[in-house]
Amino acid sequence: MLAVTNIPYPSWLNPADNTWQLVAATLVGLMSLPGLAVLYGGLVRKKWIVNTMLMVFVGFSATLVVWMLWGYNLAFGPQSHFGPTGSFWSGFIGHFTPLSTAGAEQGQAVSGANTLIPFHFPTATLAYFQFVFAAITPLLFLGALVGRLKFKAWLLIVPLWITLVYCVNAALLWGGGFFAQKGAVDYSGGYVIHLSAGVAAFVGAAIIGPRRWQDRENAFPSNLMMVAVGAGILWLGWNGFNGGDPFYAGADAASAVLNTNVATAVGVLTWLLMDMFFSRQKKPTFLGAINGMLCGLVAITPSAGWVNGTGAIFVGLIAATIVWFAWNYLSRIRPFSKVDDAMGVVYTHGIAGLVGGLLVGILADPGMVQYGVAGRHFKGAGSFSVGGWFYTHSFHQLWEQFLAALWIIGWTAVGTTIVFTLVKFLLGGLRESDEVLSLGDVAIHEEEAFPEPTFGEPLMTPSHIHPDNV
């Protein structure tokens, strides 16, 4: 028999950190599959359930392929240095190189611009963790486009958008690029993910055009139970979303998880109270609670590890209040009233992400320390903190957050316009025909989520699994 010996881990590998990072990544992945697939499936009309859920699966898959071939190193690899050190172009983007060798995957993970100390887990762990963040971003703005977007168009939009928009934004804020060097922070993606998704949703929906008026007039959720399941997966999955971003299983991860749940709970209650006292119906609604949940989750994302518990309460309260008024009043004003955002992505992700990012510059507590960072504002070896106006009486951090937000909004709008216009040119249009739009899933996929055969007729069976074809 072979003698039992200790596994020869590399000296830099910490099993606890590696395990937590993989668990956190899996939680974030579950937010997409099945989280968003089930949530969206419950929100759309019955005839669009299959198409919408399949687009979520396809977007997730396409992003992973892009991520392995060039996306990861483009966003988080060594900087290309197109300009002088310290300039915008010196920290603009990484390299178009694949992550495909044994050494690349199993070596110690490091940040491309050396803004973080070397991690205690392999590059494969970091690459997968960053992938699930990249994957969920186009899936978020998909929510604004459902019910009319060509399936073939989606196959092209995802890889192009990830490459042109997401990787650039991630490199500039997370990969040690220009805005990271200037001091802007985005703890888990309020800007890189949610603000950019909101902008892409607005631009994409404007280019594609609205749904058929019949579909807009009858846009009732097909299944609130599916919505509840999907929303629950999102909420608890967010523990990995924000809790994994310290990259270590430490106190800062625990604080991020607690703050995330506090802000979310406050967001739910705030939206319901707004509905009860200020809406036309004066009644609490389940969909309203889901909107409040999203506001809290999204708004705390850029600040989860920077604010204390009291700050988290204010983040949830302020974000839910602002987004509630925006949803109910801004949506009536041009140009918002002319853009058919099917699921309110512009509001619950775009505006909530912007509010949360700016609140970092106001509510960030210098006493909240993030460890493992090899850069500025040291509070002991390998750690730093961020101070908002409330504690420092300085608007410096708020200014840096504002400038980063302007970039995200501007570049995402330009990049999304380029991607959608190019795909429209290549395919001769982005919308399905009116005939297809009237039928939905049956016309596009020959499948239905809930088939209802008429009396005396057989259940509709997709042609590719029909007995005659077996």
PLM-predicted stretches and their roles:
Residues L2-V470:
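Glycine- and aromatic-enriched membrane alpha-helices
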